Amino acid sequence: MSTGVQKSISAEHAAGGHSGTSREPPPFDYSTIPPGHYDLAYRRGRGIQSKWHHLKFQRVAQELTGYRRVLDVGCGPGTLVGMLSRDHEAFGVDITEPQIEYANRVYAAAPPAFFACAVEDLPDELGQFDALSAVELIEHLPPEMADRTLRAAVERLRPGGKLVLTTPDFRSAWPLVERIVDRLGEVEYYVQHINRLTPAKLVRQLEAVGLREVRVRKYLFLAPFAACFGWRFADRISRLESGFVENRLGLIMLGTGIKAD
């Protein structure tokens, strides 16, 4: 992440609607995450973290079926774009330059498929897209910046195009899971997640940026954690909990909406 953007997020985090008490985490320095960190976890193909990423991206990819030209906003190291490039004309944008350098090195068969900039600074010649994805992005942004980013992204969406967004449900058991993962892992998600949404808040957010037919569902409950007993076992659990169980107990929200004509 560039210094300017890091300062912007830090300033908005300090000035935004947070309490400012000692319980509020300090701004997170995203430059400390090694390039390709999450992509390498995905590629590992074993364990809870890898299964989490596989199931997460598979569901997003399903939602994008039938949409040819796709932009992944906050693409990080390019994992989803790499998945989509088999069936879509896929692009990624992220403000963290080292992650984009990794993405261009690993996934860009025909550069430039990835852009190191804010979504509003994308080249005009890219035009509009049939669909947008934003996977676990907005929880990392102060609310005002999240709103601006989504509005700028929707500007890049053609009329009738689709936005697919995921973010943790802080009304679910996610906060507990987050604290446990923070204690056991290398990355502190509690410090990173400064925009803590619920289904009702996410619906309002998506409608406010000009989307219609807004839906918020939930997914990812026990299945990723079942990967410690085997990859195929986790897939079986995923199929069993799909639908009612996930939508009641899922840790991650899947928000979708269509841009008005």
Please provide the spans of the model-predicted regions.
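Conserved class I S-adenosyl-L-methionine
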Residues: 164-184
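A short glycine-rich, Lys/Arg-flanked "PGG" loop and its adjoining helix->strand segment in the class I
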Residues: 147-159
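A C-terminal cap/extension of S-adenosyl-L-methionine-dependent methyltransferases
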Residues: 178-182, 204, 214-261
